[in-house]
């Protein structure tokens, strides 16, 4: 999955970018308070993308 597609799904679900690290970005879902690291690669493997979406309740 492309990183921009994953970020679009996160924004639609109400998540926001908390901060940018050197290798990862931290996204937070204010509804459940969970923060998840999203790697800064153009292509993110499907299992990892599904895990991130599931943890942030963005499925």
Identify the meaning behind each predicted range.
Residues 1-19, 28-59:
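Basic nucleic-acid-binding interfaces
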Residues 22:
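Cytochrome P450 catalytic-core helices
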């Amino acid at each position: 999955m492309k990183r921009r597609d994953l970020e679009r799904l996160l924004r639609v679900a109400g998540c926001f970018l908390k901060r940018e690290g050197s290798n990862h970005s931290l996204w937070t879902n204010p509804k459940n308070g969970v923060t998840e690291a999203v790697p800064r690669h153009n292509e993110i493997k499907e299992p990892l993308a599904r895990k991130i979406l599931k943890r942030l309740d963005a499925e």
